[in-house]
Amino acid sequence: ISESFLSVAGRLLDMQGTERTPASDVSVDLQLRRLTVWTENGLIRQSQLTYQPHLQPIRVESENCIFVADPKSSFIEQHVSSVDGALRLITWFGRRNFYEKFGRFWSVVTGSPHIAPLQLSFEHWKAYWRSEHEQDAAWGGVPWRGPLPLDVPPHAHRPTDFSVMDPSLDDVASDIANRAGCPASELPFVPPLDGYSTGIPGGGTGR
């Protein structure tokens, strides 16, 4: 998926276990480029079921994206029997991404009363993946053009609702525009018109 705005009521990927063990060379691959993504409940969830315990590994490559999620959600959420097994199910390669609003980046719940849920903050997320898997990431600080419509149903969201400031007026907005392939120095001058916004959708080139 590339150069788009996505608004999802649940998650981008919600996976349940299967009865049969998947082949060793089978995985789910997500490639995300220059997106602005709103997911009400986080990006990914994996759930083992009593009679469907087998989950496919997930590999994500994400570059120059802005991920926005409900503050109560977890970016990645897993309901599994083993924390170690859960960590092996996710492979992440991130480059120059922005993360907004949510604070739990990875949550693993085993259901065992003797094992506390694993919850990783942004700093722990970066420490786990290190620079080989998560480069130049930023949490918070996107200069939005206006308040985000967090209480509006996702189906009513518009790309302009998630626009950043005019890149000629803000350094971070300029950086986002550069990552989206629209360097501020190369943007044509457009005189302001009544009812027209000069903001561009963060992380994407759509209008």
Predicted regions and their residues:
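Extracellular beta-rich repeat passengers
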Residues: 1-207
